[in-house]
């Protein structure tokens, strides 16, 4: 076949994928919806809509339902997505463990397990992770219907297009082809993504930023990072990586960061840094509800909520530095909403006003007006970001078309 012929076939396949995705997205977002409404909103020919919906029904991805006509006449036939028969596994790979969750296509959690993964090399970690997923599948075989995808999210530098991991903060990796290893073992479509960016996408699909197309999520945990949603999509840079706001310098004379710089946001607004700051003050003799032998982010937030002055001052201090950095991001991206995630949000009544105060003095007035700063709604759902990657692949047609063809 000539290159021109191959290109023509490729273009036809792409058009099929885009058209199927357009129909599925409308049903997912607005269902119950009629075929006529789908044709009007998608601007596809009614015959094309009929053909695509027939294929989706035959595959079991959508179903017809009766809907009472508004005129009180004959019931109209509408369409909704079918989510119960298709399952995906989402994995949140942490520094020492993995949370593995079974989802249906509505994002409902059907099962969840935590597996310790103390391995410290790329090879042993891959072996242990794949075995943990296999064990999870075996444990929940009775609940599992059609497994359509496995998705893994993790901290580090991830190339989602190649499915390779180039850096992780706790073990040395070298072009780790995790997607290839997963697909070879489990024979399903697999995805890999960055944990914070994937959480930002999950908030857009299912959580605090469902009502807007442009948002920034900032998460404080072992480090500090951001996920940026622009026009409803994850904003990514070269090799799929962007949003390392934890390494913006906020204190030029501050402590040395593990990146080699001094005074990065992460040296102030990370769980360990917050705990160490409170611990140092306690050792200096400052009074607090926080016990010296239990100085954790959880007890610090709890004390701040009860009005403890030391805990509140530290949370406010962290909030001001977060606000300073977020103001820079606001001036760059002009989002419609800011979402804050991490254990520190347990003290949101202290934290969020401190962030907002800084934004109100350092972000452009036109950008900060009517800009909500809210707490994450999904931070407690470890693997929801992994499922968001599966959801995206259904909505953009990549996984959807694969299901239609197989």
From Swiss-Prot:
SUPFAM superfamilies: Actin-like ATPase domain, Winged helix' DNA-binding domain. Keywords: Activator, Carbohydrate metabolism, DNA-binding, Repressor, Transcription, Transcription regulation. It comes from the Bacteria. Disulfide bonds: none annotated. Induction: By N-acetylglucosamine. One of its GO terms (molecular function) is DNA-binding transcription factor activity. Disruption phenotype: A double deletion with priB is disadvantageous to cells. InterPro entries: ATPase_NBD, HTH_MarR-typ, ROK, ROK_cs, WH-like_DNA-bd_sf, WH_DNA-bd_sf. One of its GO terms (biological process) is regulation of DNA-templated transcription. The keyword Transport does not apply. The keyword Ribonucleoprotein does not apply. Residues 35-44 bind DNA. PANTHER family: N-ACETYLGLUCOSAMINE REPRESSOR, ROK (REPRESSOR, ORF, KINASE) FAMILY. Belongs to the ROK (NagC/XylR) family. Acts as a repressor of the nagEBACD operon and acts both as an activator and a repressor for the transcription of the glmSU operon. Genetic interactions among priB, dam, lexA, nagC, polA, rdgB, rdgB, rep and uup link the PriA-PriB replication restart pathway to DNA double-strand break repair. This is DNA-binding transcriptional dual regulator NagC. It comes from Escherichia coli (strain K12).
């Amino acid at each position: 076949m000539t290159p021109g012929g191959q290109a023509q076939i490729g273009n036809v396949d792409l058009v099929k994928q885009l058209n199927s995705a357009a129909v599925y997205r409308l049903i997912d977002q607005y269902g119950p919806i009629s075929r006529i409404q789908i044709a009007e909103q998608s601007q596809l020919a009614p015959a094309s809509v009929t053909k695509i919906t027939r294929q989706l029904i035959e595959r079991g991805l959508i179903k017809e339902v009766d809907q009472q006509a508004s005129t009180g006449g004959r019931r109209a036939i509408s369409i909704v997505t079918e989510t119960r028969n298709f399952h995906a596994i989402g994995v949140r790979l942490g520094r020492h463990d993995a949370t593995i969750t079974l989802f249906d296509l509505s994002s409902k959690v059907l099962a969840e397990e935590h597996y310790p993964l103390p391995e410290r090399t790329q090879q042993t970690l891959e072996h242990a992770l794949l075995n943990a997923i296999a064990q999870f599948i075996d444990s929940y075989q009775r609940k599992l219907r059609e497994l359509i995808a496995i998705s893994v999210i993790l901290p580090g530098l991830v190339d989602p297009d190649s499915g390779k991991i180039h850096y992780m903060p706790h073990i040395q990796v070298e072009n780790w082809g995790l997607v290839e290893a997963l697909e070879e073992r489990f024979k399903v479509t697999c995805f890999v993504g960055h944990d914070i960016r994937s959480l930002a996408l999950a908030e857009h699909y299912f959580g605090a930023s469902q009502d807007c197309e442009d948002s920034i999520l900032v998460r404080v945990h072992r480090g500090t990072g951001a996920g940026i949603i622009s026009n409803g999509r994850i904003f990514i840079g070269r090799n799929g990586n962007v949003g390392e706001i934890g390494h913006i310098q906020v204190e030029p004379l501050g402590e040395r960061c593990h990146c080699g710089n001094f005074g990065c946001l992460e040296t102030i607004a990370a769980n360990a840094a917050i705990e160490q700051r409170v611990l140092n003050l306690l050792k200096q003799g400052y009074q607090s509800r926080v016990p010296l032998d239990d100085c954790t982010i959880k007890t610090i937030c709890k004390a701040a909520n009860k009005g403890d002055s030391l805990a509140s001052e530290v949370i406010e201090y962290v909030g001001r530095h977060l606000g300073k950095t977020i103001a820079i991001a606001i001036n760059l991206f002009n989002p419609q909403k800011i979402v804050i995630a991490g254990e520190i949000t347990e003290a949101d009544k202290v934290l969020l006003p401190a962030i907002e105060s800084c934004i109100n003095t350092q972000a452009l007035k036109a950008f900060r007006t009517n800009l909500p700063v809210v707490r994450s709604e999904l931070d407690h759902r470890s693997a929801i970001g992994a499922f968001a990657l599966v959801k995206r692949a259904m909505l953009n047609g990549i996984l959807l078309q694969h299901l239609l063809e197989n």
